[in-house]
Amino acid sequence: MPASVTPTPGVRAEETRTQLVRRARKINRVLAETYPDAHCELDFDNAFQLLVVTVLSAQTTDKRVNAVRPTLFAAYPTPAAMAAADRVDLETIVGPLGFFRAKTEALLKLSAALVENFDGEVPGRLDDLVTLPGVGRKTANVVLGNAFGVPGITVDTHFGRLIRRFGWTEETDPVKAEHAIGALFPKSDWTMLSHHLIWHGRRRCHAKKPACGACPVARWCPSYGAGPTDPAEAEKLVRTEGPN
């Protein structure tokens, strides 16, 4: 961000609903310009792969999940193949991700449910996806938005942190936060909004030390100053790639 940008400290408490909507959409537009290549950072070739890698991404990094993906799907390319997998063999593949026994159990149950209830196909409806073992709204929205083109908001830790820092909502419950943010944006923006905030959270708006002085949306952020505001110091905190 150019050093000449001087953020306005904070957002007035009397901000109206209309002003909030305008500010939120402005932030999203600027983030879209800042991260034109924002996308899901989990690798996948189809809806089944995306569903599986999203489940596996819990409590680990996208980078680690991407590393095991080729071996995993070479061995088990379909729900039927994965449902019939030898447990020990599957545990060996997902072992590097941590919590491998629980994750193996989750994949076996998930694949079996796809075979038994959906003829081995990943459903394209939220109500169906959340009936699958281990699949909540966050995972379902990732799959819908990125594999089916159905708009969805992904409330992960980065997204939740940023919407509160931006003063868009105080909600901490993921479902309530999803609905609160969805009301600020047209549905067509939801999926890319999720990518923009997640990318920004991974690259600049870090949990412990946000790069406030190198933030392209600092002038619209009431949390400006939570991290270093000196541009040179803040720039050192910027990651060119997501840590995951």
Predicted regions and their residues:
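Catalytic cores of DNA base-excision repair glycosylases
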Residues: 11-241
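Mixed-charge, low-complexity intrinsically disordered regions
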Residues: 1-4
